[in-house]
Design a protein with these regions (language model features):
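Active-/binding-site microenvironments in catalytic and ligand-binding cores
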Residues: 1-167
């Protein structure tokens, strides 16, 4: 169920990994760190250095959404082929920060050889892909609610992700 805004469970890449119905719901609800990297170029690689300034926030709020601005290309032919990517080193940095959920406004966090997918999912970090309308979030501090369907033994699920801004 990798269509629209959806969540990947570890089982997507990790044999014997958690399936979508085994993702603890508390990982899907709570304070979130919002990293704005707007206007990323096609094929731009997001490196650990791009994220390091957010270390303290990531330690306090281990859910993270990265805004690249790419979702605005949804109707273009290159949406699925040219999107920005998270490097394996950036994924390792986020795992070291204790992140347990990452969301992006791209169709995938990476491409073959899927270093970011493997790093995240082997450490039980749930991945949300294809987020939209992130420009509507005006605060860098908000509660994320992104619940997957309880689909037994599946590797992914659609989610309805919402940001509840805190005063």
């Amino acid at each position: 169920m990798h269509c629209g805004t959806h969540m990947d469970a570890p089982f997507h890449f990790i044999p014997g990994g958690s399936t979508i119905d085994q993702i603890p719901l508390e990982r899907c609800i709570g304070p979130c760190t919002f990293i704005r990297l707007k206007n990323c170029a096609p094929h731009q690689v997001i490196e650990a250095e791009d994220l390091e300034m957010h270390f303290d926030q990531l330690r306090q709020r281990p859910k993270v959404i990265i805004e690249t601005g790419w979702y605005k290309n949804w109707a273009r032919d290159n949406y699925f082929s040219d999107h920005p990517l998270i490097s394996g080193n950036a994924a390792k940095f986020l795992v070291r920060c204790g992140v347990h959920l990452i969301g992006v406004d791209t169709p995938s966090v990476d491409i073959n050889p899927f270093e970011a997918h493997l790093e995240f999912l082997s450490h039980n970090v749930a991945i949300i892909e294809n987020l939209t309308n992130l420009e509507r979030i005006h605060s860098d501090v908000f509660e994320l609610i992104a619940l997957p369907l309880k689909l037994t033994a599946r590797e992914a699920s659609p989610v309805r992700a919402i940001a509840v801004e805190l005063a």
